[in-house]
Amino acid sequence: MTEAVVVGAGPNGLAAAVTLAQQGVPVTVLEAAATIGGGTRTSENTLPGLLHDDCSAVHPTSLASPFLRSLDLERHGLRWRWPEVDLAHPLDSGSAGVLLRSLDDTAAGLGADGPAWRRVFGPLVAHYDDVVAEVFRPVLHLPRHPLSLARFGVGALLPATVLARVWRSAEARALFGGVAAHGFYPLRRPLTSAVGLMLTAAGHAYGWPVAEGGSRAITNALAARLTELGGTIKTGVLVESYQEVAHADVVMLDLAPGAAANLLGSAMPARVAKAYRRYRHGPAAFKIDLAVRGGVPWTNEACRRAGTLHLGGSLEEIAGTEREIHAGRLPKRPFVLVGQQYLADPTRSVGDLHPVYAYAHVPHGYPGDATEAIIDQIERFAPGVRERIVARFVRRPTELAEYNRNYVGGDIATGANDPLQVALRPRVALDPYATGVAGVYLCSAATPPGAGVHGMCGFNAARSALRALR
């Protein structure tokens, strides 16, 4: 009987395992950490009872994922919760760009820029599932929705700073630029509009929800579904050589490419090993968790209701800071993402103490301390927040890499998002999941479609393995 082993119990490893198990393949998942989840783990990092997401926090692509939507994970305890305001981007003037799930309400809030917002996002939202069905697959495939893909591609190929010229107000331009900055790539480069378009449209199509009880609920539900299908998960098992798993007919590796090359050793063709070791990792995150009494006192009222905030000032300021981190320098005012998941999910708080999530974009492997720079950015738009902080927990890039080995140098996107690598990750190949070793596949976020808690990397890789078994 065909047997499969999955190395790594992050969302993509579990997605691969579930996909194989659905086809009757016995699956064992081996996870080095004491708990499953990879980047979706949730911890009481600051004070007992306060739930902080360790990395992945807000999930616009999860509800859009064809794989996750097919599983009915709510049956296994997953509950999605939405904040009143999905995203806010405050400016020094006291105003803010505000993303709501309603396209019309968002456009209305942008005033004179509302019609242009509708023109850009209306068609994409109307055909969002068709676009997702294309971009969540490998680049080399026969499109089922070519017109929808083409319409998306026209804008996606542009630098974010160029596409943003369709809006005149600082609020609309900053709102789009902050979302585009999720790509960890200079906004004046080609293809940076793609992230901004996809995540903003996801907000209008599905919202930017959080998982009740923390992001761990997503992978806990995946694990429950796998167990229901007869799969097995073993934690605290570090796989250090291919020989430990070579007995399996199918091996799925939820690993960074360099780690996969090291694991497979001489079994991997030299040309593939060279490509994997040359795989480029991008800038890092510097993350802090805060316990804040009474919440963050944002100057802008919409920010007090927002589940996610982007702190970086104007589009031009964000473009400058992203350029700086790519040059290896920490800006005085780095781009910061703040999560207030407790607004949608009060179970994460204890009384008047609330967990606040924040990370800054910093250079790859940044060895310094960005804690005060992050708090300064929050204070910039919420004067007095320092006095409300009662506890903090810090994860530097090196500590993020220790927490999750796929985050090489603190790169939580599991790879640089330059256009060539986005198109051809993790190497030039007809099958991006094949490692060159028979029966062994890479299924991490280093494969298409890339980062995000959507499980599609694992799903696609498992589908590749199943085709080879036929």
Task: Give, region by region, the residue ranges found by the protein language model.
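N-terminal glycine-rich phosphate/pyrophosphate-binding loop and immediately adjacent elements
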Residues: T2-D130, A416
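A conserved FAD-binding loop/helix module that cradles the flavin
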Residues: C443-L469
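Flavin-binding catalytic cores
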Residues: A116, G295-V296, R329-P331, Y366-R405
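Rossmann-like flavin
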Residues: D92-L191
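A glycine-rich dinucleotide-binding beta-alpha-beta segment and adjacent secondary-structure elements
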Residues: R173-P186, R333-L337, G384-P448
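Mid-domain catalytic core of redox enzymes
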Residues: G231, V237-S349
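Helical element adjacent to the flavin cofactor pocket in flavoenzyme catalytic cores
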Residues: M198-E240
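Glycine-rich phosphate/pyrophosphate-binding beta-alpha loops
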Residues: D54-T61, A181-Y185, A285-K287, A344, ...
